[in-house]
């Protein structure tokens, strides 16, 4: 009865929302997944959903009161069509096919006007009968980014070919800067467009100034970058705009969708865009005339007026879209002839000062822009930055630039001085205060002393990636103003600016507006990807190929700048990373637990990294008393010192050393504890049921397993002394990084829950149960292959914040099994390690 009442009280889902099989909901309108009901309620009332809902309703209403008109002379004007249809019913808007003049969309004030036009038997223009039919109703879709612009930096493939011909890494970086910088022709186009816009705005707003900022002027201009413009309307108008805007900004919450608007492709969607722009008001009835007075208007109204001037009075400008809800209200536009895109803001004097500061830093040391260009391109290729709509969860170019600045400030000696140091050096400068923030710094680079740092570009780039891979960024605020970090949470009392500072997974304080987190929009996933890609790039920079010139394969910065392979290009090639918390346990014991899971539980084989599969230096060195005792047992029989994880896996090794291996196992078996014997007895019935085809492979696995059972037996007998005097350590000379080859022999991750339920009826528990499950699954699965199913590269890195970071990358995966194996490991491995260490619940 209670179930019936609860089911009847469930609120029905809106038509735009559907339930997801695995739980949660999906908003079809916004294209996002929502985990639960409270989040769904928040989403439905959120700005993005409401905006799209209103936009869809508006589009549907347009379609219902519009007709499609064709068969008119090519020279027909909009006014002529308006005169014809105005006689039938009041016309709201007309959009014509200006390119070819083949059709027009006529929108009436009401649906009755559309019906009246369709009922007219004959509608003529200049004696020619017009074809009038209902407008085709298209399903509403969220706007997506338009087609790529012709003005773009080189693609990674073309760039890599150019970089291969360079002599060293420094030349590669300089070549990258040269290829990404805009050409003289593009720079000239920007100047012409700026002049055209200035001339137009001056006509309508006498005394105004149009000032460029951002990448166009800060020394880090890239081909195809947007033209950022600040429209200064004069003292009176600026005070009117900025005073009201600041109040709105204080009450406006930043979000990743603040500027999430689209710039539609002009050739395919321009007609629909123009219809939308004109839907709210008839622009013909609201003339935009020169000499406008903006006094008394709100910031949104002024933004709307400026948008109309752009839309109707600047030749070649289209796709004009106002975003009054952004942190800094902005107008996006495109210029068809030049292919440039631009943004106009009305209250962004702080951005002008920011751009001047970036320009100063760019001029102080030639290495600064070269590193910024390289890091920006790296982030773009790896999809870490470059939000296509101005907002979004990724890093922006300004944030990347500040990351480079902060890194250069922390070198010894610093490559760049901090802003605080610059102010101390030039105390005689006139103070610059904008919106209450101190924006003072030297105006002339000659006033600043040269840096004493003589590091090469290749060294600095390598250190950049290692630096950020080693930081726990979610627990720090990076402050480029003074070159320091602030640990989180704030100490008491917190700094004055902390009240408005929006904390997130990545925190970079704006050097001037101290309460602004430049990375406030960055999502947790984007922050994690940034750190993992930094770690991957750092590993590449530590390989010999980084500084070793080659004409046959990528070297230097080329491997860093190549995009990762897509899923279509190589199924299962994508790797994964798994974090194992140390939890107060030593790194050596944590690694031993990880090894036990892979080898004992999952029946895999671990081999030390070799030169062909590990170019990054030394592997983990195991030299405990435990290992020495084990080596004494096996020294003569096996013919070499077999460490804990050094297990032979090749067929010839199996054949030549089988007798000695069995002898070794026999010797150590006498020292087994009762616990180890129980492990052995659990698997013997399974072994007796093997078929001949499986026996060879599983006998080898059994040999490995018996070898480690004997090892664990010795551990139990020696646990006190062995751990007390342990010398096991990770080789920190390679930044605490080690690498092995992991061979996967059996698909023991498939059907594991079912088999575990079956085995739980017995006496086995914990790790013993998991081993029994794997043995049973290995017998059941028919993996008909002579070699391993997969070969993976396992990299372990000890992080600063008490965790062991594991990276698994497929090396050989013909069946594409690695993706499902990785998915299984992401939750299974940390839980099993915690259980082995005695601080976790059974799996």
UniProtKB/Swiss-Prot annotation:
Question: In the UniProt record, does the keyword Transcription regulation occur?
Answer: no
Give residues annotated as binding ATP.
215, 354
Any one Gene Ontology cellular component term annotated for this protein? nuclear speck
What gene codes for this chain? tut1
Q: What is this protein identified as? A: Speckle targeted PIP5K1A-regulated poly(A) polymerase
Could you tell me what reaction this enzyme catalyses? RNA(n) + UTP = RNA(n)-3'-uridine ribonucleotide + diphosphate; RNA(n) + ATP = RNA(n)-3'-adenine ribonucleotide + diphosphate
In this chain the PAP-associated domain maps to 456-516
Coiled coil (UniProt feature): none
In this chain the RRM domain maps to 54-126
**Source organism of the structure:** Xenopus tropicalis
Q: Where is this region: Disordered?
A: 134-157, 241-292, 653-691
């Amino acid at each position: 009865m209670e179930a019936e009442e609860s089911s009847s009280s469930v609120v029905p889902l809106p038509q735009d929302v559907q339930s997801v099989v695995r739980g949660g909901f999906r908003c079809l309108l916004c294209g996002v997944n929502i985990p639960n009901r409270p989040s769904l309620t928040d989403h439905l009332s959120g700005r993005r959903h409401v905006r799209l809902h209103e936009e869809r309703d508006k589009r549907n209403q347009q379609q219902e009161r519009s007709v499609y008109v064709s068969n008119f002379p090519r020279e027909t004007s909009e006014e002529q069509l308006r005169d014809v249809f105005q006689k039938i019913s009041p016309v709201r808007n007309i959009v014509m096919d200006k390119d070819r003049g083949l059709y027009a969309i006529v929108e009436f004030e009401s649906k009755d006007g559309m019906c009246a036009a369709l009922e007219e038997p004959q509608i003529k223009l200049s004696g020619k009968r017009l074809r009038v039919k209902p407008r085709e109703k298209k399903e509403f879709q969220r706007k997506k980014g338009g087609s790529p612009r012709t003005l773009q930096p080189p693609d990674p493939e073309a760039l890599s070919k150019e970089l291969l011909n360079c002599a060293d890494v420094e030349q590669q970086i300089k070549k990258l800067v040269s290829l990404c910088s805009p050409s003289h022709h593009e720079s000239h186009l920007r100047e012409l467009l700026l002049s055209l816009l200035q001339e137009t705005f001056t006509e309508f707003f006498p005394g105004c100034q149009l000032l460029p900022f951002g990448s166009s002027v800060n020394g880090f201009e890239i081909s195809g970058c947007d033209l950022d413009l600040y429209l200064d309307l004069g003292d009176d108008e600026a005070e009117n705009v900025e005073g009201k805007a600041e109040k709105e900004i204080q009450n406006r919450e930043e979000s990743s969708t603040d500027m999430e608007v689209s710039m539609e492709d002009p050739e395919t969607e321009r007609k629909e865009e123009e219809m939308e722009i004109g839907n709210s008001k008839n622009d013909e009835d609201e003339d935009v005339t020169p000499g406008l007075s903006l006094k008394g208007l709100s910031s949104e109204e002024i933004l709307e007026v400026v948008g109309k001037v752009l839309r109707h009075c600047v030749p070649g400008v289209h796709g004009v879209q106002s975003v009054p809800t952004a942190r800094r209200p902005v107008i996006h536009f495109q210029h068809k002839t030049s292919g440039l895109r631009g943004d106009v803001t009305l209250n962004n004097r702080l951005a002008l000062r920011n751009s001047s500061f970036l320009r100063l830093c760019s001029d102080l040391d030639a290495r600064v822009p070269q590193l910024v260009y390289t890091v920006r391109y790296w982030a773009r290729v790896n999809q870490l930055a470059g939000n296509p709509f101005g907002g979004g969860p990724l890093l922006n170019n300004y944030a990347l630039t500040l990351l480079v600045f902060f890194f250069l400030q922390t070198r010894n000696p610093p490559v760049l001085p901090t802003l605080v140091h610059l102010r101390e050096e030039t105390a005689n400068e006139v103070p610059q205060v904008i919106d209450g923030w101190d924006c003072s710094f030297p105006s002339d680079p000659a006033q600043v002393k040269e840096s004493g740092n003589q590091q090469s570009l290749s060294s600095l780039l390598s250190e950049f990636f290692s630096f950020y891979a080693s930081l726990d960024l979610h627990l720090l605020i990076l402050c480029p103003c003074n070159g320091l970090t602030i640990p989180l949470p704030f100490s008491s009392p917190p700094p004055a600016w902390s009240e408005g500072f929006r904390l997130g997974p990545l925190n970079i304080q704006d050097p001037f507006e101290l309460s602004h987190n430049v990375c406030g929009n960055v999502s947790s996933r984007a922050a994690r990807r940034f750190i993992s890609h930094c770690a991957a790039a750092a590993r590449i920079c530590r390989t010999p190929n980084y500084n070793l010139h080659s004409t046959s394969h990528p070297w230097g910065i080329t491997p860093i700048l190549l995009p990762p392979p897509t899923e279509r290009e190589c199924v299962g090639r994508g790797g994964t990373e798994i974090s194992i918390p140390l939890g107060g346990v030593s790194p050596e014991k944590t690694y031993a637990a990880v090894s036990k899971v892979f080898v004992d539980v999952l029946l895999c084989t671990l081999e030390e990294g070799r030169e062909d599969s590990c170019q990054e230096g030394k592997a983990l060195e195991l030299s405990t008393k435990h290992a020495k005792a084990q080596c004494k047992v096996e020294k003569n029989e096996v013919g070499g010192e077999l460490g804990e994880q050094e297990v032979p896996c090749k067929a010839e090794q199996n054949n030549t050393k089988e007798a000695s291996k069995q002898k070794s196992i026999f010797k150590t078996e006498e020292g087994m504890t009762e616990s180890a014997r129980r492990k052995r007895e659990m698997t013997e019935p399974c072994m007796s049921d093997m078929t001949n085809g499986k026996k060879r492979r599983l006998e080898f696995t059994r040999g490995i397993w018996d070898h480690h059972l004997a090892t664990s037996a010795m551990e139990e007998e020696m646990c006190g002394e062995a751990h007390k005097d342990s010398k096991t350590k990770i080789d920190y000379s390679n930044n605490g990084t080690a690498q092995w080859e992991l061979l996967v022999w059996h698909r023991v991750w498939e059907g594991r829950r079912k088999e575990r339920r079956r085995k739980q009826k017995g006496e086995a528990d914990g790790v013993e149960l998991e081993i029994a499950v794997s043995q049973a699954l290995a017998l059941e699965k028919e993996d008909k292959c002579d070699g391993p199913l997969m070969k993976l590269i396992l990299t372990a890195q000890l992080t600063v914040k008490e965790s062991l970071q594991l990276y698994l990358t497929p090396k050989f995966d013909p069946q594409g099994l690695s993706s499902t194996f990785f998915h299984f490991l992401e939750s299974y491995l940390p839980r099993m390690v915690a259980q082995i260490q005695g601080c976790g619940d059974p799996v």
